[in-house]
Amino acid sequence: MEAEKKMVLPRIKFTEHKTNTTTIVSELTNTHQTRILRISVTDPDATDSSSDDEEEEHQRFVSKRRRVKKFVNEVYLDSGAVVTGSCGQMESKKRQKRAVKSESTVSPVVSATTTTTGEKKFRGVRQRPWGKWAAEIRDPLKRVRLWLGTYNTAEEAAMVYDNAAIQLRGPDALTNFSVTPTTATEKKAPPPSPVKKKKKKNNKSKKSVTASSSISRSSSNDCLCSPVSVLRSPFAVDEFSGISSSPVAAVVVKEEPSMTTVSETFSDFSAPLFSDDDVFDFRSSVVPDYLGGDLFGEDLFTADMCTDMNFGFDFGSGLSSWHMEDHFQDIGDLFGSDPLLAV
């Protein structure tokens, strides 16, 4: 029985074959929709080739698989140009819808890329949702984020960040705007005003030194010329004039107190200023050269010298007419002061 059931109920293979055709009908000009005419035929005992009945029966029982074919023929009834125009409109509408969908999906991406790529990004600067630009920096020592404030533009916030970075991390810090070496040197260079003040102070000290040295020279010249004016010695005047002119060329200005330079000017006069021979030497113009020895030597008062000597004091040429007391009294009058002038 089981064998018979298997032979009666074999397996079935179903296939469908479809064909599409279009035809133009003039009667459908008023309608804008296309009509479809579908024709279908099913062959339950389909074979690949034709044969006798016996062979078919034999194959039906012998074959393990049954084959069924379905043929479908679809005919599209169109109304010519109207139908084609409507189809073109439908296709154009579909294309427009597709284009709108593609634009709606692509446009936000494009706008986002333009906003992000069009604007320049700065270090330590971020934009708030309401449009302001915030600047902040991290302190490497405290390990804390420092708030620098909000600004209207990104450039202002970037400049504030650069200043804070230079203060915290030095001139080698990473900044948004590159710093040229000229500006760096200008920032590091000291201000010129203190130098000018120092120069002015040095000039003032030099002027004070030269003034003090000139005053000291004038006072020294006055002190040196006072005995010459009293004794009326031309040799002494020439000597002191040469001395007063020579130290002027030898003065060296130094940035030291004025007392040191004054002491240096007086260092040339370490030797005694006046000797007995220079002060009381009357060989220049007053006393003739034939005295030969010292002014107050032993040969001064010899008999030969006294006979021929005459000083212009109307004493006479002889030794008897020369009174020693009267002569020295006149010398004392030279060093004294007139009583009338003193009053």
UniProtKB/Swiss-Prot annotation:
Gene3D superfamilies: AP2/ERF domain
Ranges of the DNA-binding region feature: 121-178
Highest taxon, organism lineage: Eukaryota
Start-end of Low complexity biased regions: 208-220
Bridged cysteine pairs (disulfide): none
Role, per record: Component of the cytokinin signaling pathway involved in cotyledons, leaves, and embryos development. Probably acts as a transcriptional activator. Binds to the GCC-box pathogenesis-related promoter element. May be involved in the regulation of gene expression by stress factors and by components of stress signal transduction pathways.
Protein name in UniProt: Ethylene-responsive transcription factor CRF2
Organism: Arabidopsis thaliana
Name of encoding gene: CRF2
